[in-house]
Amino acid sequence: MRSRARAHVATLFLSTVVASALLATGGGAAHARTPSPTSSIGLPSSVDGGAWASGHLQGTAIDRRRGHMYFSFTNLLVKTDLAGRPIGSVTGLTGHLGDLDFNSADGRVYGSLEYKAAQAFYVAIFDGSRITRMNMDARTTDVLSTVHLREVVRDYTADMNGDGVFDGDTGNTPDHRYGCSGIDGVAFGPDLHGRGGGRLTVAYGVYSNTARTDNDHQVLLQYDVRDWRKYERPLSEDALHTSGPASPGGKFFAYTGNTTYGVQNLEYDGDSGNWLMAVYKGRKASFPNYGLYVLDGSKPARRGEVKGQPRPEYGRIVSLLPGGLHHEPSGVYGYESGGQYGLVSLDDGRYYVAEAGTVDSGGTTLQTGRAVLHRWTGAVPNPFAVRGTAR
């Protein structure tokens, strides 16, 4: 693992040089982007996250007060200014870093972090103020702490068919309660019980499997992170810790139909009070398989049936917003849009919707990411419209 990490850091160093050169010189036509101007009264129409030898773009977060954007590239975190200039990066992650969100209460960036082979799932907490240079190792610097999520482990490792064998990281099995493949989407927002108060919401990944009926919900866990400092531990991939809350503060279910790896990006919109869930589309013919679902923030969670379970089960059900496209046979509402690679609400009807891509650099394929400013229109099928420089 260590030799692999050293080789990866060396590759990322090359990527840093390439990305900086692209930003400085404009690069080739296939990937050149002019950084959008910023001002004291506005935000740019787009923020370029660079090009990297990494996994693909997973999520984005913005620190508006300091003028920083964060990009998760699966095994790499990149910090830029709002002109897209790299400020720093965090390497050394061999797990899967997913969606991100910025916590305005403590000024840190929270993300989902999976180690499926080790059956370990964490919230990764990055101290952005300490990310000051490129290629900072997550294991040997003080930029990252982690909190273990025991509830996710319980559902991920559940032996649903009772054969005494856990089948591992595969969707082709009856194992994994609710089809849980781990975690991905994360966002800060109100308590879904309707009692107020900011919570960190963590969404399950869910395997695509058209043969089972117990995987048709998005599963959301909520945590009060104000006392999480007592759980936080540095990342040690050679000795993964289990320090974290024994259970979530709430567990909620949204009936959408099965998707491919669950909620990729979760975002709370302070303007509408609704929650957005961007997903990779599912494959079940009995569902519409939309790319975006919206939770109705005006309706507190209610007790109801968690449909399709092996035995009757009841839990806290959250409602989809009755708007957009509607699939009458299933009763599911939703939209067709982007957001699967990054979604940031500015809480005033505007969003940064991320785009992912690749470029070739001397025979090496680099992953790219860009956050593009949109406004919410509510139109169907795509409720987002591109707009220019923000006010």
Predicted features by range, described:
Residues P44-N75, H96-D99, D184, D191:
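Beta-strand-rich domains and repeat architectures in extracellular enzymes and scaffolds
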Residues M1-R33:
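Secretory targeting and sorting signals
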